[in-house]
Swiss-Prot record:
Coiled-coil residue spans: none
Reaction equation(s) it catalyzes: oxidized coenzyme F420-(gamma-L-Glu)(n) + D-glucose 6-phosphate + H(+) = 6-phospho-D-glucono-1,5-lactone + reduced coenzyme F420-(gamma-L-Glu)(n)
GO biological process, one term: carbohydrate metabolic process
Lineage, opening ranks: Bacteria, Bacillati, Actinomycetota, Actinomycetes, Pseudonocardiales
Domain of life of the source: Bacteria
Database matches in NCBIfam families: F420_G6P_DH, F420_G6P_family
Quaternary structure, from the entry: Homodimer.
Entry annotation: catalytic residues: 38, 107
InterPro entries: F420-dep_G6P_DH, F420-G6PD/mer, F420_G6P_DH-rel, Luciferase-like_dom, Luciferase-like_sf
Residues the record lists as binding substrate: 192, 195, 256, 280
UniProt entry tagged with the keyword Nucleotide-binding: no
Protein name: F420-dependent glucose-6-phosphate dehydrogenase
Pfam hit, one: Bac_luciferase
Family: Belongs to the F420-dependent glucose-6-phosphate dehydrogenase family.
C-alpha cells in the first residue's frame, strides 16, 4: 500500500516551527511525519538541532492520525539502548501507538561531541546496532531482563509502562549488507533517494527481499521507506535555489561520517557548485515532471515515500506539493 510522508527538517528549523509543519502535513493529507535526531546540525549558519525525543510527543499531542518516526536515531553511542526503549514505549502510549523507531549506525558529527571517543569502523557500528535492537525489543516484551552483550549490559531491567504492541523498528541502510538485515530484523527499511536507480533495483531491494525471506516473511511484510529529496516549486528557479542549504547531502558518505563539527561540514558543503548540489534532488516545477522522476522508486518496490523539501518556506512546499503532486501520486498507488 502506498503511503506518503513528510520529513521535518530538524537541521534547518527550530522545534516550534517544525511542530507546525507536522500539523500542516496531517492537514494536507499525508500519512506520516519523520524527523532526524542530530546533536549537531549539518550547517553552522542557520543550522538547528532540536531533540527528536522532545519534539515527537509535542507532535503527537497536536495530531490525531499521522505516524511519527525517527529517520533516523542512533541508539548506540549517545544513548543507552534501554533508555531509547523506555522513551519509545512512553511515546507509543502517549500517541496511541503512532510512533516508529527508525534507527541507523550513526555519524561521527553527532556522537563524538558527547563522548570524545574515536569514531569506530563500520563493523563495530553495525554490531552495536544489532545488539541494541535485540536489547530494545527484549525490554518491550519481557520482564526483569538480564542482558550481557559485547557492548551493553542490563541487570533485572524492566519497563513498567509499555504498549501492548511493541513499537515498529525501521532500519536504515545504504548498502546491501544492512539492507538484508533490515529485511530480516526490521518492521521497516529506510533509505534515501538520489544515488542512482541501480542501487535500489540491483542491491537494496533484492537484499531486503532476501532478508525478509530468511525470516520467513515476504518483502510486503516490510514497510519499504525512502526519503525522497524533492525540491518542488511552481517557480523553477526557486526550486533550484532551494537546494543550496542542503549542500551537505552532496558530500560523500566517507566525508560525512568523519566530520566532527558543523563548521567543517558547512565549509566542505559550500565548496560544491549548485549543479552538483542539485543532483541529489528531484528539482521540478511541473507536477507531471516530478511524478515521472518519483515513479521509478515505486517501480523498484518502495511503498512508503517520505518527501523532504529543502526550501525555507515549508508552508509553501506543503501547499504546492499537496495540491499539485500528491493527487497524482495517490493515483499511482
Amino acid at each position: 500500500m502506498l503511503k506518503v510522508g513528510y520529513k521535518a527538517s530538524a537541521e534547518q528549523f527550530g522545534p516550534r516551527d517544525l511542530v507546525e509543519y507536522a500539523v500542516r502535513a496531517e492537514e494536507v493529507g499525508l500519512d506520516s511525519v519523520w524527523v532526524s535526531d542530530h546533536f549537531l546540525p549539518w550547517r553552522h549558519e542557520g543550522g538547528h538541532a532540536p531533540w527528536a525525543l522532545a519534539w515527537m510527543p509535542a507532535v503527537a499531542e497536536r495530531t490525531k492520525r499521522v505516524q511519527i518516526g525517527t529517520s533516523v536515531l542512533t541508539p548506540t553511542f549517545r544513548y543507552n539502548p534501554a533508555v531509547i526503549a523506555q522513551a519509545f514505549a512512553t511515546m507509543s502510549l502517549l500517541s496511541n501507538g503512532r510512533v516508529i523507531l527508525g534507527v541507523g549506525s550513526g555519524e561521527a558529527l553527532n556522537e563524538i561531541a558527547v563522548s570524545g571517543r574515536e569514531w569506530p569502523e563500520f563493523k563495530e557500528r553495525f554490531a552495536r546496532l544489532r545488539e541494541s535492537i535485540k536489547l530494545i525489543r527484549e525490554l518491550w516484551t519481557s520482564d526483569n531482563v538480564n542482558f550481557k552483550g559485547d557492548y551493553y549490559e542490563l541487570v533485572d531491567a524492566k519497563i513498567y509502562d509499555r504498549p501492548e504492541q511493541p513499537v515498529p523498528v525501521y532500519i536504515a541502510a545504504g548498502g546491501p549488507v544492512v539492507a538484508k538485515y533490515a529485511g530480516r530484523a526490521g518492521d521497516g527499511f529506510i533509505c534515501t533517494s538520489g544515488k542512482g536507480m541501480e542501487l535500489y533495483t540491483d542491491k537494496l531491494m533484492p537484499a531486503v527481499k532476501e532478508g525478509a525471506e530468511a525470516a520467513e516473511k515476504t518483502v510486503e511484510d516490510v514497510d519499504r521507506t525512502i526519503e525522497i529529496k524533492l525540491s518542488y516549486d511552481r517557480d523553477h528557479e526557486k526550486a533550484l535555489e532551494n537546494t543550496r542549504f542542503w549542500a551537505p547531502l552532496s558530500l560523500s558518505a566517507e566525508q560525512k561520517h568523519s566530520v566532527s563539527s558543523a563548521e567543517e561540514m558547512e565549509r566542505l558543503a559550500d565548496e560544491l557548485p549548485i549543479d552538483q548540489v542539485a543532483k541529489r534532488w528531484i528539482v521540478a516545477s511541473d507536477p507531471d515532471e516530478a511524478v515521472a522522476q518519483i515513479k521509478p522508486y515505486l517501480d523498484a518496490g518502495l511503498n512508503h515515500l517520505v518527501f523532504h523539501g529543502p526550501g525555507h518556506d515549508q508552508e509553501r512546499f506543503l501547499t504546492q506539493f499537496s495540491e499539485d503532486v500528491l493527487p497524482k501520486l495517490r493515483a499511482l498507488g
